[in-house]
C-alpha cells in the first residue's frame, strides 16, 4: 500500500461530504519488531483525537501520534498481558485489563512507563471497559458476572452489580446513563449512573429481534455496545449477521445493518471458543449519522447511513464499501475530533478522506 503523508484535519467539512472518499492512508504492523504479525485486540483514541492506543496478542501497548502518523511509544506488559487499552481523560494515562496472572485492571503512566494503580476485585477475565465521558469514573464487566463501578483515584470498587452475563457496558454522552448488555438473557438494561444500585429504569428485550435477524447466533454473538453522540441511538454490534440500531429511549429497532459476509474471527465476550479477543468490528461516527464496520471475511470496510430509511423489514444496506486489499476489518474506531478513523486486524490502518479530484485521476 502506498503510504501518504496526509494528516487528519479538523472536521470543517461535514462527515457526509467526505464519507465516501475515505481511503487507507497509513498502515502499521501491530508490533514491527515481532517475528510474525499478531492480532490487534483493541483500539482507542484520546479525548482530543491526537493519539491512538492499541493492544495486541503480543502483550504490547502501542501509542500512535495521529497528526504525525507514526508510532511514538511501545510498552510491554508481558507479566500481566493486556486487553481493552483505554485512555483516561489524561492523554498520558492508559487503563487496561489483564489477560493473565490475575484479573485486575491497571492504570499505566506513559511518561515513565510505570503503573500508578491496580484495581482489584474481579475474579475472572474483564471483557468490557467503559470510561465516563466527563469524570474519572469507569465501569468494568467481567466473566465473574459482575459489573464493577470504579473511580480512577481509588483502587477499590465503588460498587458492584451482580447480573447474568453482563458482558458489555457503555455510558451515554452525558455520563448520567449507563447501558449494560446481558447476552445470555438477550436484555439491555439502562441505569441512572448515580443510582445504579436501584433497579434499571428501562430494559429492552432483544430476544424477538434475535429470533428474527440472528437466529443461529442467539445469545452468543454480541460484541459492541455504543450510544450515538446525540444520545438517541444505541448500537449493538454482533459478530456475524449484522448490527442492531435501537432507539435509545424506547428500545425499538430502527434498523438492522446488513452486508457482512461471515464472522470476523474474533471471540464475542460470551464466547468460550478460545478465538482471539476483540472489541467489536463496528463503531459510530462522532456526528452519529454513520456506522463504520467490517464486512466479515472480506477486506472491504462498510459504511451505513443511519439517516437513510431501511426497507420494510428494517434491513439497512451499506451506502458504500471502502476498498482495501491487505487485511479485513475486525476492529473499528472513529476519531472523536478529526475526520479519520482506524481499523485493525493484524495491522492498524489509518483512514483519511482523499481529494475527490485525485481519486478521479486514479
For the regions a protein language model found, what residue spans apply to each?
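WD40-repeat beta-propeller superdomains and closely related acidic/aromatic-rich repeat-like regions
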Residues: 1-362
Amino acid at each position: 500500500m502506498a503510504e501518504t503523508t496526509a494528516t487528519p484535519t479538523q472536521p470543517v467539512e461535514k462527515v457526509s461530504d467526505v464519507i465516501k472518499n475515505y481511503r487507507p492512508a497509513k498502515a502499521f504492523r501491530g508490533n514491527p519488531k515481532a517475528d510474525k504479525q499478531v492480532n490487534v485486540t483493541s483500539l482507542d483514541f484520546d479525548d482530543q483525537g491526537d493519539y491512538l492506543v492499541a493492544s495486541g496478542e503480543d502483550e504490547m501497548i502501542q501509542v500512535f501520534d495521529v497528526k504525525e502518523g507514526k508510532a511514538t511509544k511501545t510498552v510491554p506488559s508481558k507479566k500481566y498481558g493486556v486487553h481493552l487499552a483505554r485512555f483516561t481523560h489524561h492523554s498520558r494515562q492508559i487503563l487496561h485489563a489483564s489477560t493473565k496472572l490475575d484479573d485486575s485492571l491497571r492504570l499505566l503512566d506513559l511518561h515513565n512507563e510505570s503503573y500508578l494503580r491496580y484495581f482489584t476485585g474481579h475474579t475472572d477475565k474483564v471483557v468490557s471497559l467503559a470510561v465516563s465521558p466527563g469524570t474519572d469514573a469507569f465501569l468494568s464487566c467481567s466473566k465473574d458476572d459482575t459489573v464493577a463501578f470504579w473511580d480512577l483515584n481509588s483502587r477499590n470498587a465503588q460498587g458492584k452489580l451482580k447480573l447474568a452475563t453482563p458482558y458489555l457496558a457503555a455510558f451515554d454522552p452525558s455520563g448520567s446513563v449507563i447501558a449494560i448488555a446481558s447476552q445470555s438473557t438477550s436484555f439491555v438494561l439502562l441505569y441512572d449512573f448515580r443510582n445504579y444500585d436501584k433497579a434499571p429504569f428501562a430494559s429492552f428485550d432483544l430476544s424477538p429481534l434475535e429470533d428474527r435477524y440472528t437466529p443461529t447466533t442467539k445469545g452468543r454473538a454480541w460484541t459492541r455496545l455504543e450510544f450515538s453522540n446525540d444520545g438517541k441511538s444505541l448500537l449493538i454490534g454482533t459478530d456475524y449477521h449484522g448490527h442492531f440500531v435501537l432507539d435509545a429511549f424506547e428500545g425499538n429497532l430502527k434498523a438492522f445493518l446488513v452486508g457482512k459476509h461471515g464472522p470476523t474471527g474474533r471471540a464475542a465476550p460470551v464466547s468460550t471458543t478460545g478465538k482471539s479477543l476483540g472489541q467489536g468490528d463496528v463503531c459510530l461516527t462522532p456526528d452519529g449519522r454513520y456506522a463504520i464496520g467490517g464486512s466479515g471475511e472480506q477486506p472491504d470496510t462498510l459504511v451505513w447511513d443511519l439517516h437513510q430509511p431501511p426497507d420494510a423489514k428494517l434491513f439497512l444496506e451499506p451506502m458504500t464499501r471502502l476498498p482495501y486489499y491487505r487485511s479485513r476489518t475486525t476492529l473499528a474506531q472513529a476519531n472523536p475530533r478529526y475526520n479519520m478513523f482506524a481499523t485493525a486486524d493484524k495491522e492498524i490502518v489509518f483512514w483519511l478522506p482523499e481529494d475527490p479530484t485525485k481519486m478521479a485521476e486514479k
